[in-house]
Amino acid sequence: MGGGLIERYVAAMVLSAAGDTLGYFNGKWEFLRDGEKIHRQLAQMGDLEAIDVAQWRVSDDTIMHLATAEALMEAGSSPDLPQLYSLLAKHYRDCMGDMDGRAPGGACMQNAMQLDPDRADGWRIPFNSHEGGCGAAMRAMCIGLRFPHPSQLDTLIQVSIESGRMTHHHPTGYLGSLASALFTAYAVNGKSPRQWGKGLMEVLPEAKAYVTQSGYFVKENLQHWSYFEKEWEKYLELRGILDGKSAPVFPKPFGVKERDQFYIEVSYSGWGGSSGHDAPMIAYDALLAAGDSWKELAHRAFFHGGDSDSTATIAGCWWGVMHGFKGVNPSNYEKLEYRQRLEEAGRALYSLGSKEDTILGP
């Protein structure tokens, strides 16, 4: 791993939070269901490059992403997984004390408060057929920073699933966590984004095997398994990238209005990006179209009528791993809330992730 990568690790954490902050706009834009209205307000501010985030707060997404990162940091090198899971549970529970004005999701709030990290298996919660939301996906990217090596794929699968189902014990929820982490690892390894979707489809059977052998609510998980897989397959076919080689095909026109409609179509309940399958999907769609343009990424993933801060948090992280801070106006992140913590997390995860350490299973 080269010297430039440490800056990209830092950018991954910082720009994830910048995306969150911009997409959230102190709650004003996350819950505004009209992308065209958001883009008009954005234009009145002088567009993305004119925004100074000094008075803008991060949402629950960044608070929970930091919780994941800081648990991974505390676990150190070569942790055993049950110990790591207890630390994740502790950080998720404790971060609920910093949710005032950050619009935390119901499943995250309710379930994190019930985690009991001091008890054996106190990080487990029962299966719930209503926990397919994006709360697991929005906080898992840094797992891919910590375990980026192909030899660590099994660990990445296990940690992303178990961290996800601490609040979202439903495949649509925790497989979103897997997608967020896996695509981050792909970005670290310089894998072309058009290959990522195919990679996810190849990893899903391994995820299913893990959930089956973990022996916890297996029947219920398998009954609800197919939705995530089918939705992703449908999306990859639509963009023409199921083969992992072809260039993605976008409809014309595909402006703000058309994207809003598309995000509704891929959603579970009509709010694009609010579930575990479509939050990473919308982030991925934006990344494929944006190339190295932070502004184009923002216009597609941060500013739309769906769950914009969650798609922004995920997309900002992946883009940061790939491009660092290249072409990003410093006003978008210089006065970011918790910037120091985010930078420290990026550096610490680089230090841990650059060693191909062995992880001890349960």
UniProtKB/Swiss-Prot annotation:
EC number, as in UniProt: 3.2.2.19
Catalytic activity: N(omega)-(ADP-D-ribosyl)-L-arginyl-[protein] + H2O = ADP-D-ribose + L-arginyl-[protein]; alpha-NAD(+) + H2O = ADP-D-ribose + nicotinamide + H(+)
Enzyme class: hydrolase
One GO term describing the cellular component: extracellular space
Entry binding sites for Mg(2+) 2: 307, 309-310
Cofactor: Mg(2+)
Activity regulation, short description: Its activity is synergistically stimulated by magnesium and dithiothreitol (DTT) in vitro.
Residue runs in coiled coils: none
InterPro entries: ADP-ribosylarg_hydro, ADP-ribosylglycohydrolase, Ribosyl_crysJ1, Ribosyl_crysJ1_sf
Cofactor binding summary note: Binds 2 magnesium ions per subunit.
Record keywords: Hydrolase, Magnesium, Metal-binding
GO BP terms in the entry: protein de-ADP-ribosylation; protein modification process
Quaternary structure note: Monomer.
Record-stated family: Belongs to the ADP-ribosylglycohydrolase family.
General function of this protein: Specifically acts as an arginine mono-ADP-ribosylhydrolase by mediating the removal of mono-ADP-ribose attached to arginine residues on proteins.
Protein name (database record): ADP-ribosylhydrolase ARH1
Organism for this UniProt entry: Rattus norvegicus
Lineage: Eukaryota, Metazoa, Chordata, Craniata, Vertebrata
